[in-house]
Amino acid sequence: MNIRASRFAMFCRPSVAIAAVLTSAVLMNGTALAHSEQDQNGKSRILTLKLHDFKAQMRELVEGGYDIAGANPASSTVDIVQRANSQQSFNKEIFGQVIESKIVDTTIAPDVGYKTSAEVDEIVHRLANNYPDLVTVESFGRTHEGRDLWAIRVTSQAKQKAGKPVVFLNALHHAREVMTVEVALDAADYLATNYGTNNEVRDWLDRAEIWIVPMVNPDGSNKVWTEDSMWRKNTSGSDGVDVNRNYPYRWNQCNGSSGSPSSDTYRGPSAGSENETQAMMALVGRIRPVYSISFHSYSELVLYPYSCDGEHVPQRDVVEGGGKAMAQLLPSDGGSGKYAPGTSWEILYAVDGGDIDWMYNTHNVIPYVIELNSTSQGFQPSFSAWRNKTVQKVRAAWQYVIRRTLQSGIRGNVTVAGESVDNAVVRVTSMIKEGDVGQMIKVKGDGTFHAVLVPGSYKVVVARGDRTVEKTILVGGDLVTLDVAL
């Protein structure tokens, strides 16, 4: 039986046109949902505000607990979700004018083409069955409600432990951001189906592993499909937790999350408290990716760490350079511009407890958030109009990080008495850039290490206990292999 048909058989109704107020009208097609207990009449609004001072007022909105849906820094506008029965109001003398207001019936499900958690389960296992030499699927944890968290591993000789560098893609930290699942599933499908016919894809999968988590928050996704299409958090406790404010690094340290359980950016009772967060942390710690992209929506942005005010990563040439390069590969939905790159605090507002800051600080991953689609399309664009356009466009970004993983940099294996070791440390320092603090890389469990670098001369120091080896390398456009015996 069709999964979605069986789920909604008891209360389906025809698609509806949603009324417009103030300056615009919105049409949303979908399936009727059961009424949320928090939103009995189902009528929320998305308000577009024209801000007087974009950065300062974005900060005020975050600190005021408003649910920020998306923003356009270039036009100084921000979209706010205002729930039915909400007491929040907007003083135009403080925040600027409300230039658009759309009524959104949260009891209308997303377009039928988008995927439920059950459909994702079916799709990932079908892909593994169809391509057993390329694709493996594993459950890397369970949610509060007991759903499996699925990770897809795509590489040649998939059933062997290959010791290859890893690129990590993940989607749907936030439940209402349904287009992100499409991008993640498309990446897995594209790699598997093109391995036999595309020489570049073959090279990628022969030399690297691509790990993909298409749905970090399946409990929240289920709530989007059955109760509330604007639901953002997971479903633990009475109000849920924002999984992407729950990671331990800088948790509750820079006014980038909320301590109120009713807030859409509620960070949880403690750092790393959530099943989904713990599972993601364990997976990342095990696979130790070189790059990561977390797909979110919406606003057409490429974000990189750090996310608290005034903070930058030491490797700005690699991290920021990569973010800017990806942004140039992503045309806007309107076709007249590109995605905007930057840190969250520079473009939007401070964020604490996010996954990209934790990944970089803890495991030296080069991580990004890509905010898909424009403010015109929102969280749940027409599937037929925007799904293919979006996934095809975003391929350029995840393909960029795969290519970059296999280009300028250093990779090697550390051994002692001929055996690989996992407790060595590699420090790579530029011999050209004055004051370079370098990269400190922990060797993986299989004895390998990998660092993305810009071309130049580097000093490499490999240490384990009282044993140290120092080398000098010259990095050009290709990956340099340096195996070290201690």
Model-derived features: positions:
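Extreme N-terminal flexible tails
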Residues: 33-108, 424
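Structural recognition of the beta-strand scaffold that forms the well-ordered cores
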Residues: 79, 136-141, 150-153, 166-170, ...
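A glycine-anchored, Pro-Gly-centered beta-turn/N-cap motif
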Residues: 454-457, 478
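Short helix-loop-beta-strand segments that form the rim/entrance of peptidase-like active sites
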Residues: 180-224
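Structured interaction patches on ligand/partner-binding surfaces of diverse proteins
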Residues: 465-486
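Metallocarboxypeptidase
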Residues: 226-416
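A short, solvent-exposed beta-strand micro-motif common in secreted/extracellular proteins
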Residues: 447, 456-466
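Short, acidic Ser/Thr/Gly-rich low-complexity loop/linker segments typical of extracellular
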Residues: 420, 428-454
